Amino acid sequence: KFPNAKLVVHPRGARHMAEPSKLIAGVTAVYGAEYVAKMYGEILPIPAERIIEAADETTISLNGRELLCIDTPGHARHHNCIIDQQTQGIFTGDMFGLSYRELDTDGRAFIFPTTTPTQFDPDEMRASIARLLSYQPSAMYLTHFGQITDLVKLSEDLLRHISALTQ
């Protein structure tokens, strides 16, 4: 379908992309076989020659745009965030929590940490949040869901939620 496409992935995840049996087993243990089949269908291995391991501070050029991959454990040990060097926007994956506009109240964005059952590490997550903020991002783009910009306030909310979950 995309014969020239490459997969950019954290080094800890690369082997699971080439041989996904442990990944499939882990996802199935958390969500169940029926859900995995419905949501993901058949999970196929990626040929090793199409995998790019993005170690911490790897820069990827995408059509002339420089993207900086940052190692950000906490949600999972194999997590990267991507900084668009042109805009200083950060694509956070699941690292900077989830935020749905439908849950906003009184003009404030709702944010809550994503805590995977198997790899959540609150101390690593706190350190990764601080690291992301040290880049002084213009915005963060959450996988779940969309753009957020009140980053100092939302990071305080996120850190408070992490503390509440781990007490």
Show where each model-derived region lies.
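Active-site metal-binding motif and surrounding structural segment of the metallo-beta-lactamase
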Residues: K1-V9
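Short, glycine/charged-enriched secondary-structure capping and boundary segments
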Residues: F2, S21-I24, T87, T105-G107, ...
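Short histidine/acidic/glycine/proline-rich micro-motifs that form metal-
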Residues: R12-H16, Q147
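Metallo-beta-lactamase
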Residues: R15-D71, R77-T149
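Accessory terminal helices/loops
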Residues: A25-A29, A130-A139, Q147-Q167
